[in-house]
Amino acid sequence: SCKDWELYHQAGLDSLYETVGNLNLFLICKRPEPSALRPLPEGCSIRTCRPDELDVWKHLAAEDSYADSLTDYYERVYAGNGEEQNPAFFQRCLFLCTPSGKPVATGLTWLSYARTGFPVNTLGWIRVLPGEEGRGFGRALLSELLRRSDFPLYLHTQPTSVCAIRLYSDFGFHLLTNPVIGYRKNDLNASLPILEKVMRPAAFHGLRFSNEGQALHQAALSSRISEF
C-alpha cells in the first residue's frame, strides 16, 4: 500500500522496494492474542462473499492490475477439481461492509493442501480498500477471521507489507525461522535488517519467532502449486 512505500521512502530505501517485494516471509499463530481482538466499528457488518461476487472479491483482494493473476490463483487453488465454483470458498471468504452495505475489506482462511492429504490452516488475501484504511477495518476483520479459525494458522507475506506485519505481530503471529518452506526459500534473514530500518523500534523489537514450520513445510512439499 502507499503507506508501506512511504515507510521505505522515509528510510531512504525506495530503490529496494520492488526487489524486497519478491522476498518470502512465513508466519504462524498458535493462539491469538486476546488483547488484540477488536469489535466491528459501529454500524459495520461482516458477511460472506456471494457466488455472484467474485469480481467484487478480486477488486477488494488486490489492485486491479493483478486481476488476471488473482483469477488464475482462484481457479488453481480455490475452485478445485475443475469446478467453476467451490462452496467452501464462499463459506470462508469474508467481506467487511460499511453501514451503507458497501464491502471495503476482505480476507479468508483456507484449508490448504487438503487435496494432497496434508491439510494446514492458512490466512490470505487480507486487504482494506485504499482510502478506507486507518478506520479500524483491518483489525476488526482479522479479529473475526481469527475467531472463526482453527489453529495453528499460517500465512505468507513479504517484507514490503510493513503495516500488515506489525498487525499480525499484535495478534500473536510469530515469524517462522525454518530456512525453507516447501519449494520457497524463507528470506527472514535478509528481511530483518530491512524491517529494522522501516519499522518503529518498539514494533520491530516486539517481533517474535518460531521454528515450528515443519508441518507447513511438509504440506507445501506435497504440491507444486503454492496454496497460500
Provide a role label for each language-model segment.
Residues 1-4, 155-165, 181-192:
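Conserved beta-strand-loop-alpha-helix junction that forms the acyl-donor binding cleft
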Residues 128, 134-147, 166-170:
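Conserved acetyl-CoA-binding loop-helix of GNAT-fold acetyltransferases
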Residues 1-42:
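Acyl-donor-binding surface of acyltransferase catalytic domains
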Residues 45-57:
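A short beta-loop-alpha structural element at the N-terminal edge
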